[in-house]
Amino acid sequence: MTFCSLERVVMILVEDLTIVSQREIAPRIFEMVLKGEMVADMQVGQFVHLKVPDPSKLLRRPISISEIDYDKKEATIVYRVEREGTAILSKMVAGQTIDTMVPQGNGFDISVVDAGEKALLIGGGIGVPPLVETAKQLKAKGVEVISVIGFANKDAVILEDKLRACGDVYVTTDDGSYGIKGYVSTVIDGFDWTPDAVYSCGAPGMLKYVDSKFENH
């Protein structure tokens, strides 16, 4: 079993990407589609750094890449509105451009798992988006994909349909309002099989559990 972080030496690029569309997919959760040449340099599991179009906002916002369409040169990002900076991003519309820096993060190495093997994808909350493109590319190479995703409640559940298009999906909610009541650990601790590769993104507590659960495999 392999944990899959991909380290590479890359050149950081900055480009004004064009917003193709934006919509709210859950309360305070937005999905934005961006278009531009630098999409060709994006990899699964990475994120973009967006410059908020407001001179008072000096720091870029890191946003996970959810899907990549290399043919259309489009990338989908998903983010949660937390404070003023992301609130400004949520008001942007199709046709506007946004200063974008990529690639950011090591990403996931999908080369370590082969056709016919099993990959376990584990995500919590806003950590779920980068698993979507990961699942799509793994499925395309013949890997069996099993996803376990956890949320606070039914209203917070996102991207379940896109992950189901790639394989089996288990959904947990803290309050039991949707799917299985509990946490991702509730499901994973009941598995009687061992994955060949694990890809995970979420809160520190969840990642600590994943490290502990699979450290001896």
Feature-to-residue mapping (PLM):
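Selective for proline/serine-rich intrinsically disordered segments
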Residues: 1-3, 53, 101
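Extended hydrophobic/aromatic-rich secondary-structure runs
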Residues: 9-13, 200
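FNR/FR-type flavoprotein reductase catalytic core
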Residues: 84-217
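Ferredoxin-reductase
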Residues: 12-96
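Short, Lys/Arg-enriched N-terminal segments with co-localized hydrophobic residues
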Residues: 2-10
